[in-house]
């Protein structure tokens, strides 16, 4: 159960961290679902065509970054509405994934790719009864997600570049006046976020499936957007948020196998209901550290500085 929960939460972890990087520079990207779908479809296609898991992941990340580049150009350079642009990006990503998915609908993930997602055991720790096999025997993608979340935390909170990012998210005008290249940092973080979203989508399509399945993300991108708030824009808390949602989803699958008189549709709703309850709880606790970047969702007009 724990092993499944961690694996289920991993693609969401990638998307949450990607979303945090984007929102930290003041851009609310509701296109996470679209970027995940683009990464999922292109990653699956490249995996089938080459049998190389590394190329598949790089292609998936590039697809997510391409979607993020479109978003960045419209919202940073053209100063378009961030909410509308994000929604359009999700619709666009859904269409792209449907197109690519149609081309590879008869293909299967090669064994060379599937074998890359075999569990990697941590010496000694993986031998701990029950907990060891569930937690310390995971595939390389799970460990990569954890490493990226930790690196993102140190990048945002312990480096000069991270200080620039946080300054831009709070007050881009003041950051610009102090000599920080606001546009450059916005582009970099939005593209990095898109790359991570693409990786999350590819994990869903290549590690969990053998054949293509339309709408493979099943709303994971939207959940990630909500869990960004749950994690209070902290990549370390994102680990807990993602795995908690993974546990709720895993519990849903497990309970459906029990002989209890609860509609399966209600069980499917449980993770989403829990997410809403948590968001309400966080909204009621008006703590300073729980607040989003002050410039989140606002276009920056340098001439009005």
Question: Where are each of the predicted segments found?
Answer:
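Membrane-interfacial amphipathic/re-entrant helices at transmembrane-helix boundaries
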Residues: 1-15, 28, 42, 50-55
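Alpha-helical transmembrane segments within multi-pass membrane transporters and channels
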Residues: 51-96, 249
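Transmembrane alpha-helical segments in multi-pass inner-membrane proteins
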Residues: 197, 207-272
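Helix-loop-helix "hairpin" substructures at the membrane interface of multi-pass membrane proteins
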Residues: 134-212, 235, 240
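Transmembrane helix-bundle core of multi-pass membrane transporters
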Residues: 94-158, 259-267, 293-305
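Cytosolic-side transmembrane-helix boundaries in multi-pass membrane proteins
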Residues: 170, 176-177, 181-184, 255-305
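Hydrophobic core segments of alpha-helical transmembrane domains in multi-pass membrane transport
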Residues: 15-16, 40-44, 94-95, 142-154, ...
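Hydrophobic alpha-helical transmembrane segments
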Residues: 2-5, 34, 54-62, 84-87, ...
